[in-house]
Amino acid sequence: MASPLSQSVFPHFPPPSPAATPPPAPTTPSTPPPHFISPPPHSVPPPSPPHSVPPPLHPVPPPSPPHPVSPPPHTVPPPSPPHPVSPPPHTVPPPSPPHPVFPPPHTVPPPSPHFVPPPPNMVPPPSPPHANPPPPPPPHSVPPPPHTVPPPPPPPHIIPPPAHALSPPPPHIIPPPPPSPSNHSTTIVVIFVSCGGVFFLAFAMAALWCFLKKKKKKMVQKAENIHFDEHRKVTERIEQGPHGTETAILSVEDDIHIEEDIKKSELENFRKGLHLNYGNTYNIDTGKPSSSFGHHYLHG
């Protein structure tokens, strides 16, 4: 223990310098890298999970590159690409790539090309072709749905009958009600109007006929009720003339009294009666109650 303390206390002395030289021991760690390098090659073989002999045979021949080129198009259409994609992540995780990056200066690049070819060999494994067969099952599974689809058609055939059964009744029920009220109303109105017009005309004609009949009766009665009062006065006078002769003078006065009811009677009938009773016509004033006429006769 004392020796390490003394060494730490006197670091500047020459003895420590030779002790410093031993630190190249770190070179010993350099040896581990080769050991680490060696494991990568061991890790490379594991990626070949197939363990089948054919895979290594395919990568061995040089014409393998053209073969992998052709499979990609075949692998693209089917859903197999997702399956091949999963292997690359498994191959990528290995720490082999990062370790080779450090050793390149120590190790010769040739091993890297040897490591490079395996990836392409791993990409086009025969697993895709094996994955292709599975797609056929889906087509077989798809056909069943079409077989199940045909059954639905029967329901449409069942649905139409109710529609046809329901549609006819409404039209038959709806039309009758509207026409019946309209026809009844129109017929009732026409009948009442026609009957009313006929009765009105009949009553009007009856009223006119009764009015005319009553008027004629009144006119006849008034004509019968006419009263004539006639008074005639005759006077005679004798007068002496200038030569001593005597002359007789006769004067006749007629007084006729007619009632005012004559205004309502027919004057023509009344005048005809006067012509029949009297040879001479007289002027009659309907407005005056009486009239007088004078006739003078001279006898020599």
Curated annotation (Swiss-Prot):
Instruction: Please give the tissue specificity annotation from the record for this chain.
Output: Accumulates in cells differentiating into tracheary element (TE) which undergo secondary cell wall (SCW) formation.
Q: Tell me what this protein is called.
A: Protein TRACHEARY ELEMENT DIFFERENTIATION-RELATED 7A
Q: Where is this region: Disordered?
A: 1-181
Residues on Cytoplasmic side? 209-300
- Knockout: what is the outcome? Delayed secondary cell wall (SCW) formation during tracheary element (TE) differentiation.
Q: Which residues are glycosylated?
A: N183
Q: Which positions, given as ranges, span the membrane?
A: 188-208
Q: What does this protein do?
A: Involved in the secondary cell wall (SCW) formation of vessel elements (e.g. protoxylem and metaxylem), thus promoting tracheary element (TE) differentiation.
Q: Any one cellular component term from GO for this entry? A: plant-type cell wall
Keyword Transmembrane helix set for record: yes
Subcellular localization, per the record?
Answer: Cell membrane; Secreted, Cell wall
Which stretches face the Extracellular side?
A: 1-187
Which residue windows does the record flag with biased composition (Pro residues)? 12-181
Native source organism of the sequence:
Zinnia elegans (Garden zinnia)
Q: Please report the record's description of how this protein sits within the membrane.
A: Single-pass membrane protein
N-terminal signal peptide: none
Give the top-rank taxon of the lineage listed in the UniProt record for this protein. Eukaryota
Q: Name one GO biological process term.
A: cell wall organization
